[in-house]
């Protein structure tokens, strides 16, 4: 028997996007129908090379690239990958992006699908971090906690956590000074 999945969002109810960031080509991150609904002629779509090869549209960003999109908006592509034995094929090193979006000084880290990679030690002054927690595709609870303690964002939103007991993140980061906010981002 298959599993019924309710569509996450009715994107037609949203305003058109100025910017769309796509981390990689997996269907839970690259949804052509959602993109088509949310974009207009002025929308800038930032993608990795694998998405560009499928979509034939967008601005390709590779790990380490940075774009000053507007005077108060900067977009940086950062690495997102799996390193654990047997998991590297899900998100190979060098292919996928996480993003740091700086909006008028507010720094938001969108990790994409990744584990607690060494490059996270280079993240500085992150105000809000969106961190995934769902092995084998992303981080374990312990990896997420280690990552958060490494670069110390002010706020962490765990996402992509499926059946993971995400309250463990709250418990393990209690007293760290990091505000953990749980939403229904399964």
Language-model features and meaning:
Residues 1-25, 32-37, 84-89, 114-122:
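Pre-active-site segment of Zn-dependent metallo-hydrolases
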Residues 15-18, 41, 125, 152:
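Alpha-helix C-terminal capping/helix-to-coil transition sites in glycosyltransferase folds
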Residues 57-73, 93, 145, 149-186:
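Binuclear metal-ion centers of metallo-dependent hydrolases, dominated by the metallo-beta-lactamase
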Residues 45-54, 62-64:
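Short, polar loop motifs at secondary-structure junctions
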Residues 31-39, 166-172:
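Metal-dependent catalytic neighborhoods of phosphoester/phosphodiester hydrolases
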Residues 84-149:
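Active-site-proximal loop/helix segments of hydrolase catalytic cores
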Residues 66-76, 102-108:
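Beta-strand-turn-beta hairpins that frame and shape the catalytic cleft
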Residues 2-3, 17-26, 46-49, 109-112, ...:
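Active-site neighborhood of phospho(di)ester-bond hydrolases with catalytic His/Asp-centered motifs
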């Amino acid at each position: 028997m298959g599993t019924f999945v309710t569509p996450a969002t009715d994107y037609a109810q949203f305003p058109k996007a100025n910017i769309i960031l796509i981390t990689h080509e997996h269907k839970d991150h690259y949804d052509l129908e959602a993109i088509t609904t949310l974009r207009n002629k002025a929308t800038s779509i930032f993608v990795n090379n694998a998405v560009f090869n499928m979509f034939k549209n967008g601005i390709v960003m590779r790990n380490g690239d940075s774009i000053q999109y507007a005077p108060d908006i900067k977009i940086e592509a950062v690495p997102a990958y799996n390193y654990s034995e047997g998991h590297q094929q899900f998100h190979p090193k060098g292919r996928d992006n996480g993003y740091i979006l700086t909006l008028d000084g507010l720094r938001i880290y969108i990790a994409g699908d990744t584990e607690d990679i060494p490059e996270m030690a280079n993240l500085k002054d992150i105000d809000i971090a969106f961190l995934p927690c769902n092995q084998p595709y992303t981080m374990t609870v312990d990896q997420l906690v280690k990552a958060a303690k490494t670069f110390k964002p002010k706020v962490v939103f765990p996402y992509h956590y499926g059946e993971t007991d995400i309250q463990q993140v709250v418990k393990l980061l209690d007293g760290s000074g990091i505000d953990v906010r749980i939403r229904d981002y399964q």
